[in-house]
Amino acid sequence: MNLADGRAPRKTAGNRMSGLLQAEEEDDFYKTTYGGFNEESGDEEYNEDRSASEDEVDSDFDIDEGDEPTSDHEEDEPKKKRRVVTKAYKEPIQLLKPKPKKPEAPPNTAAKSRPEKPQEPPDDTVDSRKQMRQSTTEHTRQTFLRVKERQIQSKKKKGPHLDRPLTQEELLEEAKITEEINIRSLENYERLEADRKKQVHKKRRCAGPTIRYHSMVMPLITELRMKEENVDVEGLDHEQTDRTHAGKCSRSFITFSDDETFERFFPRSKRGKFSVRDVCPVTHKPALYRDPITDIPYYNSKAFKIIRDAYKKYITTHGLPNAAMATTMGPSADAAQRNTRQKIIIKQSVPSA
């Protein structure tokens, strides 16, 4: 690792460099080669010409590109030729003594020293002509000539325009021609109108049953409540009742063309026979049960006992209803009838608790 990289620089570094440069020996190479490079005074004339030319160039910038020079004699003046003077180079003499400072000249001295040229009075006609270039004026002149020639040629082709009034015969002939043209146009119009009517599609009427759906806005139906009004007999004013405006609602209607279509979409259901509900003779309530012997409906167990007690009393007094039937029918009863009667008797003889 280099120690010089980490070392801090000295405070007096570079103090003697200016003295070494001043004590440096002059080299003869710069004095002999190419005639020497020592500077010589004597360029005052060159500097004056250059400053004058620079002033002239600056003044030219004020003129627009499209404007022509104000005076014609300025173009005839000979242009000054700039010459470049090359002299031998001489090394400047280095002096240890400080050079005295020159007083600064005011910047506007050169501008004031220049003689001001008297301005020529402006001429409107000259300025307007000089603002346009020669090429522009030439093109404008040629265009004007071409337009004029075309106008002359068009007048020659048209010939003289005669404004002679027409005679009565000429007017009648012209009216006949106009009439024929109008008749032809009318015939064409009628033919086109007939063709258009043929092409119009006629509305087809639906054959057969139809169903029409119609929706509309209708006023809302409200219930009218009658209010009692107190009538004043003495002739005082009656109290006016407030009328509330009813709202509106939407209603839809479906219309069928015939009854058959309506019945096909909305068939009528067959009404069945309504079964009459039995009523208990004891409690006068809807019966829930039925006695198998007497075939009397009853509501609960209490009603059932009352019905059976009445049935027993009827048997003791009047006898069985099947025995009475047997006496009326006589002894020629079939065996089947006897068997059924016996079964009934056995069935009736079993009392239910």
UniProtKB/Swiss-Prot annotation:
Residues 155-205 bind DNA. Keywords: Chromatin regulator, DNA-binding, Nucleus, Transcription, Transcription regulation. Residues 54-69 have a biased composition (Acidic residues). GO terms for biological process: transcription initiation-coupled chromatin remodeling. It comes from the Eukaryota. The keyword Nucleus applies. Residues 70-79, 113-143 have a biased composition (Basic and acidic residues). GO terms for cellular component: nucleus. InterPro entries: Vps72/YL1_C (IPR013272), YL1_N (IPR046757). It is found in: Nucleus. Belongs to the VPS72/YL1 family. Deposition-and-exchange histone chaperone specific for H2AZ1, specifically chaperones H2AZ1 and deposits it into nucleosomes. As component of the SRCAP complex, mediates the ATP-dependent exchange of histone H2AZ1/H2B dimers for nucleosomal H2A/H2B, leading to transcriptional regulation of selected genes by chromatin remodeling. This is Vacuolar protein sorting-associated protein 72 homolog. The lineage of its organism: Eukaryota, Metazoa, Chordata, Craniata, Vertebrata.
